[in-house]
Every structure is written in structure tokens, then in C-alpha cells.
Regions:
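Residue(s) in the substrate-gating loop at a strand-loop-helix junction
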Residues: 149
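Active-site helix of classical SDR
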Residues: 128, 165, 173
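Active-site loop immediately N-terminal to the catalytic Tyr-X3-Lys motif
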Residues: 106, 154-160, 182, 223, ...
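Canonical Rossmann dinucleotide-binding motif of NAD(H)/NADP(H)-dependent dehydrogenases/reductases
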Residues: 3, 7-40
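Substrate-binding pocket helix/loop in short-chain dehydrogenase/reductase
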Residues: 104-105, 109-117, 216
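Short-chain dehydrogenase/reductase
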Residues: 244-258
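Alpha-helical segment proximal to the catalytic Tyr-Lys
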Residues: 133, 178-182, 244
């Protein structure tokens, strides 16, 4: 057994993961499983669920992967009941489910607000209400990890309610972490920034300069886009005993953008937190002309 395996203490533990079948979620589940964790996953995407099942089956992982809506309290309850029957313990909860749409606040209404809050905040409350009593009853402590976003920590024009919901998750986690600390349960957040995934691409809107190396170098101090493993590594760390004295905080696997955050209202293209491609192209052309 390696030093990490000895210190991490993940082998044989059980993790409930909401939204764990695609993109970031699948990377997190697969990395947890690689460290001996038995995952119980709920995800709305039926194709992604089937794909994740196949991957875990081929790896010989003991798992529960079910198609369902984590925003539905009954579906969440059913998943936890399956975990009770199968393994009789919950050691880790990872809340990944999230989503939004881009629109100015004045162009949205109560139906849109409710959908965003239900997706990004309410399901976290339901999942925690199911996980915490089980962790307390188990007497082994536990770790709750919420996937939030850099937008919980800065202005996000076009995403007012989404950023507010994610900020609410952050504050909920801080408060819950204090309430459950005497039980040895830790609560933390992981707030990534730009990690290219199909879901991120589907949001659209604004300029696309972050798809170019030049744009990434301008926007991200470390000079590259994030990888799903940058996020999954953070989750594995927070699930493990290597972080046993860390609670009520947020990890930022973002290449430094939280430290350097700034939104700019570029002429003709509106709000963006990066330099538009047309400006980069003009600058490159000017440099070439001068040369």
C-alpha cells in the first residue's frame, strides 16, 4: 500500500454523488473509485448513466449508478435507501448537480429563478439532510463536498441568480461545517473556473476567446485551461483523511483566476471576463505589421 493510500483512508468507503455521470461528474466518480471508494451515483442523463456503468463494471468497481433527477427529493431518498441496503454507510457526499442559462436579470422571471435555485441550491439542502444523519449515526465522521463556481465569488453579469445560488451554497457549507464539526463531519466547497466540457460549451453567449491559446493566456494566470482532473483531484483530497483538519472552506482549482478576477465590458461585445478574440486578433495583426 502506497503512502497516499495509507494516509487517504478511502478504500472501502462509500460516496454518494449527485450528477456524477458526465463531464466533471464522471471524472470525479472514476477517480474516487480508483482510490477504493464505492460510488452511488444519480444522474438525469440516461446515456451518460449507461456509459458510466459500463466503465465501472469493466473496472470491477462495486457501485450503484441510477438514472434519476437529483432535484427530486423522492429520487434522492430512494438513492440513499439503496445505499443503506447495499452498504449500510455513507462516508462522503459530493454535490455536483448544477446548471443555468445566460440572461440579464431583468429578462428573467420567477419561473427561471425557481429553476436555477432548485437546480443549484435546493438539491444540496435535500442531499445534506439525508447524508448528515447517516454520517452521525455511523460514528465515523464524513466529508461533504459541494461543486460551486468562481462565479460565487465575483460579479457575473448574465448569471445573477445562478451566482447568488452558488454563493448561498458556499455560505450554507460554512455554517453547516460548524454545526457538524463535533461529529467529525467536514463540509467544503470546490469552485473551479474554466474547465472545457460539453455542458460548458452549450451555455454559449459572449466571446469565445477562451477557446484559443492566446485568450487562455490572457485570462488564466497559469496559462492553460483547467482539466477535469484538476477538479477531481481536489474532490479526492477533500474526501480523504489527508484533509481531516480542513472544513468550512473552498478550494479554487482555477489556475489563479480567483486571485486575478475581473470582468470587462468590452465595446460591441458586452460583459466578459476575458479579452475578446477580435481584440487579440487585431493585436496580433498590429504586431505582425510592425515586425
Amino acid at each position: 500500500m502506497s503512502w497516499f493510500e495509507q494516509r487517504a483512508g478511502l478504500d472501502g468507503t462509500v460516496a454518494v454523488v449527485t450528477g456524477g455521470a458526465g463531464g466533471l461528474g464522471a471524472a470525479i466518480v472514476e477517480d474516487l473509485a480508483a482510490n477504493g471508494v464505492r460510488p452511488a451515483v444519480i444522474d438525469l442523463d440516461d446515456a451518460a448513466v449507461k456509459e458510466l456503468r459500463d466503465v465501472l463494471d469493466k473496472q470491477g468497481v462495486d457501485h450503484i449508478v441510477t438514472q434519476g433527477d437529483a432535484r427530486d427529493p423522492d429520487a434522492l431518498t430512494a438513492l440513499f435507501e439503496q445505499v443503506d441496503e447495499r452498504w449500510g454507510r455513507v462516508d462522503t457526499l459530493v454535490n455536483i448537480v448544477g446548471g443555468t442559462f445566460r440572461a440579464q436579470f431583468v429578462d428573467t422571471g420567477a419561473k427561471g429563478w425557481d429553476a436555477i435555485l432548485r437546480t443549484n441550491l435546493s438539491h444540496v439542502l435535500h442531499a445534506c439532510s439525508l447524508a448528515v444523519p447517516r454520517m452521525q449515526a455511523g460514528g465515523r465522521g464524513g466529508s461533504i463536498i459541494n461543486l460551486t463556481t468562481i462565479e460565487a465569488h465575483r460579479a457575473a453579469p448574465g448569471f445573477a441568480v445562478y451566482s447568488a445560488a452558488k454563493a448561498a451554497v458556499e455560505q450554507f457549507a460554512r455554517t453547516l461545517s460548524i454545526e457538524v464539526a463535533p461529529d467529525g463531519i467536514r463540509v467544503n466547497n470546490v469552485a473551479p473556473d474554466y474547465v472545457p466540457t460539453p455542458k460548458l460549451a452549450s451555455l454559449g453567449g459572449g466571446d469565445s476567446s477562451l477557446s484559443t491559446p492566446e485568450g487562455v493566456r490572457v485570462a488564466i494566470p497559469m496559462g492553460r485551461a483547467g482539466h477535469v482532473t484538476d477538479v477531481s483531484n481536489s474532490v479526492v483530497f477533500l474526501a480523504s483523511k489527508l484533509s481531516s483538519f480542513i472544513t468550512g472552506t473552498t478550494l479554487h482549482p482555477d489556475g489563479g483566476t480567483f486571485a486575478s478576477s475581473g470582468w470587462f465590458n468590452w465595446p460591441d461585445s458586452g460583459w466578459a471576463n476575458h479579452v475578446p478574440s477580435r481584440i487579440l486578433a487585431n493585436a496580433t495583426l498590429a504586431d505582425a505589421t510592425e515586425a
